[in-house]
């Protein structure tokens, strides 16, 4: 079963996957899905932009 429907059922927030998502619920709104994805992309690309990795 997908996480979105389970989280919607648990929290009562309709279509939670289109809103704050599980990240927002688990962190009480301290982190957003967007901020977490942004950090993940920056970390994934850092070896290509930092000489220390060469």
Swiss-Prot record:
Belongs to the YjjX NTPase family. Its cofactor is Mg(2+); Mn(2+). InterPro entries: ITPase-like_fam (IPR029001), NTPase/PRRC1 (IPR026533), YjjX_NTPase (IPR050299). SUPFAM superfamilies: ITPase-like. Homodimer. Pfam families: NTPase_I-T (PF01931). It catalyses: XTP + H2O = XDP + phosphate + H(+); ITP + H2O = IDP + phosphate + H(+). Binds 1 divalent metal cation per subunit; can use either Mg(2+) or Mn(2+). It comes from Klebsiella aerogenes. The keyword Transit peptide does not apply. This is Inosine/xanthosine triphosphatase. It is an enzyme of class 3 (hydrolase). Phosphatase that hydrolyzes non-canonical purine nucleotides such as XTP and ITP to their respective diphosphate derivatives. Probably excludes non-canonical purines from DNA/RNA precursor pool, thus preventing their incorporation into DNA/RNA and avoiding chromosomal lesions. GO terms for biological process: nucleotide metabolic process; thiamine metabolic process. Disulfide bonds: none annotated. Keywords: Hydrolase, Magnesium, Manganese, Metal-binding, Nucleotide metabolism, Nucleotide-binding.
């Amino acid at each position: 079963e997908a996480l979105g429907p389970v989280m919607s059922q648990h929290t009562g927030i309709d279509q939670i996957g289109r809103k704050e998502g599980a990240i927002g619920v688990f962190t009480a709104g301290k982190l957003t899905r967007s901020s977490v994805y942004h950090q993940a992309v920056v970390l994934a690309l850092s070896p290509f932009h930092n000489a220390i990795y060469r």
